[in-house]
Curated annotation (Swiss-Prot):
Keywords: Antimicrobial, Disulfide bond, Fungicide, Plant defense, Secreted, Signal. The gene is ATTI7. Residues 1-27 form the signal peptide. One of its GO terms (molecular function) is sodium channel inhibitor activity. It comes from Arabidopsis thaliana (Mouse-ear cress). The keyword Disulfide bond applies. Belongs to the DEFL family. Protease inhibitor I18 (RTI/MTI-2) subfamily. It is found in: Secreted. This is Defensin-like protein 192. Pfam families: Toxin_3.
Length: 98
């Protein structure tokens, strides 16, 4: 019986943490990620190279610390190049759509 209550408490605790962390992630995206601009998403993100053209051009032309490609879920061509002004951490985006 004690195991069941501990498990229930653990699940509840993890759920609460997940709910409270979500707004921070969204706030980070709004503050740090800005769209490159223009209709460059597919041409900057489609070539399978590292670093992507998105990352290279965000650094060179916009003064950002990096660039990230965000693909739309239902549309393979719908992609945006977002310049990251907060973090230089590279992403695994080049391997995510192979």
């Amino acid at each position: 019986m004690a195991t069941k209550s501990v498990s229930t408490f653990a699940i509840f605790f993890i759920l609460v943490l997940a709910i409270f962390e979500t707004p921070e992630i969204e706030a980070y995206d709004r503050k740090c990620l800005k769209e490159y601009g223009g209709d460059v998403g597919f041409s900057y993100c489609a070539p399978r190279i590292f670093p992507t053209f998105c990352d290279q051009n965000c650094r060179k032309n916009k003064g950002a610390k990096g660039g990230v490609c965000r693909w739309e879920e239902n549309n393979a061509i719908g992609v945006k190049c977002l310049c990251n002004f907060c973090s230089e951490e590279p992403s695994d985006q080049t391997l995510s759509r192979i």
